[in-house]
Amino acid sequence: MTTQIPVPPVVSDQALPDRISDRLKGQIIVILDFGSQYSELIARRIRETEVYSEVLSYRTTAQQLREIKPKGIILSGGPNSVYDQGAPECDPEIFQLGVPVLGVCYGMQLMVKQLGGRVERAKRGEYGKASLHIDDPTDLLTNVENDSTMWMSHGDSCVDLPTGFEILAHTDNTPCAAIADHQKALFGVQFHPEVVHSVGGIALIRNFVYHICHCEPTWTTAAFIEESIREVRSQVGDRRVLLALSGGVDSSTLAFLLHRAIGDNLTCMFIDQGFMRKGEPERLVELFDHQFHIPVQYVNARDRFLKQLEGVTDPEEKRRLIGHEFIQVFEEESNRLGPFDYLAQGTLYPDVIESADSNVDPKTGERVAVKIKSHHNVGGLPKNLRFKLVEPLRKLFKDEVRKLGRSIGLPEEIVRRHPFPGPGLAIRIIGEVTSERLNILRDADFIVRDEISKRGIYHDYWQAFAVLLPIRSVGVMGDKRTYAHPVVLRFITSEDGMTADWARVPYDILEAISNRIVNEVKGVNRVVYDITSKPPGTIEWE
């Protein structure tokens, strides 16, 4: 008996077309998600071609799609087998809309099954790289080279195709690797063209988007800026908006965009909890307040946060206490500076996909904030702070936010800033956080960033930082015995932070960093290098 894999959670289907602006209706590729780990990646690949795409629930009906008016529909992969009991299925009327459809892996098998074909457990599954042998190089496979490497991940196989379908390509183990019903514009691929391992995948996606769906390149940064400013002004009017500025690319880009849209009706609040990197709070205020003339309400809460962490060693308790204190400070300061009608959040599109638990005001239909965005790692705001939300970035992926930031004048030091956890250095100090330990780690971390920055390799790494351990080791300095802290260096390469590999940093660079730390940072006499990937480890130590 086949073990049933739970179907993906249902994305709210209420008023789906209302989420899409008039400009994008009729120029959108919809991805119906069946629980694939790559659904977001498909959307990103399509957007890279300057065509808008959205990920919707597989339960989205044909009627709802008619209202959205997509130029094309993609059925994602998924963890199920189409013959599993309760396996997710789409509305079969979708295939009668006259809109081009591309099924990917599970999506192809589902299309075959729903249109009268047959899918069976493959005699031999196919996982990893495979050579694609092209039988028909037209339409979907135009400009895809024969014997291109494609990424396979399937245990089932299509054995009988529905009427009207033909085989476009095969692999050594999969007779039906790409199929098409040209008359109805229905296509399927057993591989994943969206992943980086699929060499001809981008060409295939462009073929579907432009040659089959006949899309136009309307998803541009300039068009997004113009539309966002118009939407923010329409939503907010002359009312006041509060933004909690963190210094990261999301909140900084949001601040620039909102200030361009509503000017002085935006209030940026920066709560300095004392756990940022060396010089960052001062630099943030200087950039926004003095250089770009976007006023920032600076709140020095360092002592309050540090007091909350006295004697605390558990990492989850640290996060909880930091989050709780952030809420207290935020509430006090918003009451002092307010009143405000709106809370601006740097919610991104992956957050929208992952969570459909937004609260809706029954009178206005607007989403109401009961939480501060999870990237702050601070938990929820009190329910009596009933701000309405303004979220101009909620259609964007992280890489699109960076492009937007550059376009509106955000400096590169923020646009390409390494990801930094909400609790900051507090979770890079293993054990209790004290003022002394913060100073040690802040100095060590500065040396790491300084050495790779002056060599011009800062952007070669997803993250590069130091971790302070709560132990001591014996050393010898100046013919004297020392007993001081070891520091861990953590250098990571990654595309999105979901998986990561430890970076092969040249020894001479590691040596230079180590020498500076043990000579310049009082309280450290040993430096070690973390060579753990994610998985099994995580990027951060806590």
UniProtKB/Swiss-Prot annotation:
The keyword Signal does not apply. InterPro entries: Class_I_gatase-like (IPR029062), GATASE (IPR017926), GMP_synth_C (IPR001674), GMP_synth_GATase (IPR004739), GMP_synthase (IPR022955), GMPS_ATP_PPase_dom (IPR025777), Rossmann-like_a/b/a_fold (IPR014729). The active site is at C105, H192, E194. One of its GO terms (cellular component) is cytosol. The keyword Amino-acid biosynthesis does not apply. It is an enzyme of class 6 (ligase). Its EC number is 6.3.5.2. Pfam families: GATase, GMP_synt_C. Pathway: Purine metabolism; GMP biosynthesis; GMP from XMP (L-Gln route): step 1/1. Residues 28-218 form the Glutamine amidotransferase type-1 domain. One of its GO terms (molecular function) is ATP binding. It catalyses: XMP + L-glutamine + ATP + H2O = GMP + L-glutamate + AMP + diphosphate + 2 H(+). Disulfide bonds: none annotated. ATP binds at S246, G247, G248, V249, D250, S251, S252. Homodimer. This is GMP synthase [glutamine-hydrolyzing]. It comes from Synechocystis sp. (strain ATCC 27184 / PCC 6803 / Kazusa).
